């Protein structure tokens, strides 16, 4: 996924601190964060505003192993919450805003919900 930003270094630093990627690097002008098999590329663009105009239109979902720890790191970073961490029948969900105002959801599914999803396929 490619995110455009007027301040890509700030955005990269936030994602790296909040979500602890497996890898953080730069390729040409792109800041690249790897989360498992998913790559988040962050690029500088002059044709976007400093804040997401319609942030609820797209939500980045991150499946995390410890949603409480991720939420705590986000709190330490001064993150604004759209929906704070909540337990939904054993699965944990929270939606935050990154520094550009994009919505970022952290999800930790319970073993029961994971098993139910496996049965659907």
Locations of regions flagged by a protein language model:
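Vicinal oxygen chelate
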Residues: 20-65, 71-97, 108-121
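Conserved active-site tyrosine of GNAT-family acetyltransferases
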Residues: 11-16, 74, 101
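A conserved hydrophobic helix/loop-capping motif in glycosyltransferases and polysaccharide synthases
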Residues: 2-5
């Amino acid at each position: 996924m490619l995110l455009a930003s007027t301040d890509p270094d700030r955005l990269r630093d936030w994602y790296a601190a909040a979500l602890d990627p497996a890898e953080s690097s730069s390729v040409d002008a792109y800041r690249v964060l790897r989360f498992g098999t998913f790559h988040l590329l962050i690029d500088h663009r002059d044709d976007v505003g400093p804040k997401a105009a319609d942030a609820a239109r797209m939500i980045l979902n991150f499946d995390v192993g410890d949603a409480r720890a991720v939420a705590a790191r986000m709190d330490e970073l001064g993150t604004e919450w759209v929906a704070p961490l909540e337990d939904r029948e054993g699965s944990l969900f929270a939606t935050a805003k990154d520094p550009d105002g994009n919505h970022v959801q952290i999800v930790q599914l319970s073993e029961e919900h994971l098993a139910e999803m496996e049965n659907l396929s």
